[in-house]
Regions:
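N-terminal leader/propeptide and maturation segments of large enzyme subunits in energy/redox metabolism
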Residues: 154, 226-263, 340-353, 357-362
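Core structural elements
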Residues: 245-247, 266-279
């Protein structure tokens, strides 16, 4: 029976799947670079979603079957009425981190070039907007300075706001296999709860919810004051060290009270981080879905920038997404504040560049306010 190579649509790992058109059992794709043939329980059950009884096989309009032409005409007429009555701001698209990159690009172009509206957003807004803002604030662009292989090469992995064992199981399996092969590899978990990811961890810090910034401020000060700053990296690749340290010192002294952690536990965390140059700090929704999500992400990124532990194998700050193509949506600009290729909707020069490239005079001037 023919098999089709595809991707699991669930978590951010995006595992490779071998599926059969007849709805037979699925299998992991051993050639896939992220999963290497592994599937979790949800991925293994994908075939159960392909049964025909409950699937919509044809377009429907008002609950009745329609041809594709009739359905598309209905959608187009709806957009025409909205544009005539309310202008471009009367239209909107809501898309998903489960779309293919090409589909994401087409949807974004439909909204911004054809409809003339910046009213397109993705459910990635909920899971990744804080990381997007933190990356942009730290690096100037929304770029992730790490790959999955870094987890296997690191001497220390720090999980922040991530129950990797349950939420990204195949990636956790890769981490567990790496630790089994190198027992000296350390794992620290920062999470108010004791989750499955804490099993076998070197250290668990049950910090008070929302106190991550204080903990990483304490770490930043410890690294600087104990000689772990990379002076050459700081001079050539960064700016703003002194005001950052000043702000961190104002918080670091209160870290035990703010985090609810014993000073000895904070010291143990800082010491482990300092002693292991090859460190990956991996964060997910426990950081992002927060009123201070951007500040939390920047606080941990700053610790990597201070020490130069970024941009080399086995080290760096690493944001993992909630869905397999959240990054693809960001790359094609399918958010109300972004344009294709990491261009920004709030930069007139970026708008002009894309308007010329797309030949799209209707491209909106600014993001949704």
């Amino acid at each position: 029976m023919e098999t089709v190579r595809t991707t699991c649509p669930y978590c951010g790992v995006g595992c490779g799947v071998l599926a059969r058109p007849d709805g037979g059992p699925v299998a992991g794709d051993a050639a896939h670079p992220a999963s290497g043939g592994r599937l979790c329980s949800k991925g293994s059950a994908l075939a159960e979603t392909t049964g025909l009884a409950d699937r919509l096989l044809h377009p429907e309009v008002n609950g009745r079957r329609a041809s594709w032409d009739a359905a598309l005409d209905t959608v187009a007429e709806g957009f025409r009425r909205a544009l005539a009555s309310h202008g471009p701001e009367g239209t909107a698209l809501y898309v998903s981190g489960q779309l293919l990159t090409e589909d994401y690009y087409a949807a974004n172009k439909l909204a911004k070039a054809a409809l003339g509206t910046a009213n397109i957003d993705s459910n990635s807004r909920l899971c990744m907007a804080s990381a997007v803002a933190a990356h942009t604030r730290a690096f100037g662009e929304d770029l992730v300075p790490g790959i999955y292989e870094d987890l296997e090469l690191a001497d220390l992995v720090v999980l922040v706001g991530s129950n990797l064992a349950w939420c990204h199981p195949v990636l956790y399996q890769r981490l567990a296999a790496a630790r089994a092969a190198r027992p000296e590899m350390k794992l620290i978990v920062l999470d108010p709860r004791r989750t499955a990811s804490c099993e076998g961890a070197t250290l668990h810090l049950p910090l008070r919810p929302g106190s991550d910034v204080a903990l990483f401020a304490a770490l930043l000060v410890h690294l600087h004051d104990n000689g772990f700053a990379d002076a050459a990296f700081l001079a050539s690749r960064t700016e703003g060290l002194e005001p950052t340290l000043q702000a961190a010192r104002a918080v670091a002294a209160e870290a035990p009270a703010l985090t609810g952690l014993a000073p000895s536990l904070i010291q143990a965390f800082c010491s482990l981080f300092a002693r292991h140059p090859k460190v990956v700090t991996l964060w997910s929704q426990g950081v992002n879905q927060s009123s201070a999500g951007t500040d939390k992400a920047n606080a941990l990124i700053n610790c990597h920038l201070l020490t130069g532990r970024i941009g080399a194998p086995g080290m760096g700050p690493f944001s993992i997404t909630g869905q397999p193509n959240a990054m693809g949506g960001r790359e094609v600009g399918a958010l109300s504040t972004m344009l294709a290729a990491h261009l920004r909707q709030d930069r007139p020069e970026d708008v002009a560049l894309l308007r010329d490239y797309w030949r799209a005079p209707a491209l909106p001037e600014k993001p949704v306010s």
